[in-house]
């Protein structure tokens, strides 16, 4: 029986260009990996959709086009490429280095007041702009 969650192995080379470095995270729709783009010598993120989501070619292409159009929004990674690999729709996105809010809270404890506003405000402003474009984000995580 085949797995519904697609996974790439560390050091696996995708499309003769992208080397998988680590899994960044996994949500209900996809798993995201940090990878090295050996053509441009830059780190990128690869979003690989899970099979159980039933992501069709049209849906995956639509998400890639939406992500490509969000390059001007603070805190939002833009799409650089889209392809199918091992029957898996994949989006290559900007890699944004940093700590998740979840990990920050684990390490430093609860974030209070003004500090939380400073962290969240740019993301909420970008989310508002995304909604104004008619896009509903399905999987927001900390």
Question: Where in this protein do the model-derived segments appear?
Answer:
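Glycine-rich ATP phosphate-binding loop
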Residues: 33-34, 42-50
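AlphaC helix of the eukaryotic protein kinase fold
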Residues: 50-70
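Flexible N-lobe loop architecture of eukaryotic-like protein kinase catalytic domains
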Residues: 25, 62, 71-75
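Activation-segment/catalytic-loop signature of the eukaryotic protein kinase fold
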Residues: 82
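Conserved short submotifs of the Hanks-type protein kinase catalytic core
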Residues: 86-100, 104
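Protein kinase glycine-rich loop
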Residues: 21-27, 32
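Protein kinase catalytic-loop region centered on the HRD/HxD motif
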Residues: 124-135
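Activation segment signature within eukaryotic-like protein kinase domains
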Residues: 119-120
């Amino acid at each position: 029986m085949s797995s519904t969650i697609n996974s790439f192995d560390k050091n696996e080379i995708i499309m003769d260009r992208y080397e998988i470095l680590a899994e960044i995270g996994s949500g209900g729709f996809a798993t995201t990996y940090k990878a090295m783009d050996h053509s441009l010598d830059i780190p990128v993120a690869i979003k690989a959709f899970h099979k159980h989501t039933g992501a069709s070619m049209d849906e995956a292409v639509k998400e890639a086009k939406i992500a490509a159009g969000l390059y001007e929004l603070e805190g939002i990674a833009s799409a650089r490429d889209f392809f199918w690999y091992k029957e898996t729709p994949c989006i290559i996105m900007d890699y944004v280095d940093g700590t998740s809010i979840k990990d920050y809270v684990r390490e430093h404890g609860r974030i209070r007041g003004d500090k939380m506003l400073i962290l969240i405000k740019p993301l909420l402003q970008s989310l508002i702009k995304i909604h104004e474009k008619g896009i509903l984000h399905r999987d927001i995580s900390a």
